[in-house]
Amino acid sequence: MNINITLKLFAQYRNGRFKVEQRVYKSGTTPQDIIDELGITEDKLPLGVLMVNSRHEKEDYVLQEGDIVALFPKVGGG
């Protein structure tokens, strides 16, 4: 069975990708699966905040039909 997910990328994660996109994934997909698919790695551009439906979630959360996933990179400065 497949599920429909809205994926939102912010800041540097958009570079060469997209801002918002509707995607279809298989049931049981987690945010970590999406992070891996996009090639987002800790050594290049580490994940700062992961939100699903405007709530903080962990990378192993099992996504559900209609979820909205937002990925924000770590931000530094001072």
Where are these regions (language model features)?
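Ubiquitin-like/PB1-type beta-grasp interaction modules and other compact soluble beta-rich domains
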Residues: 1-77
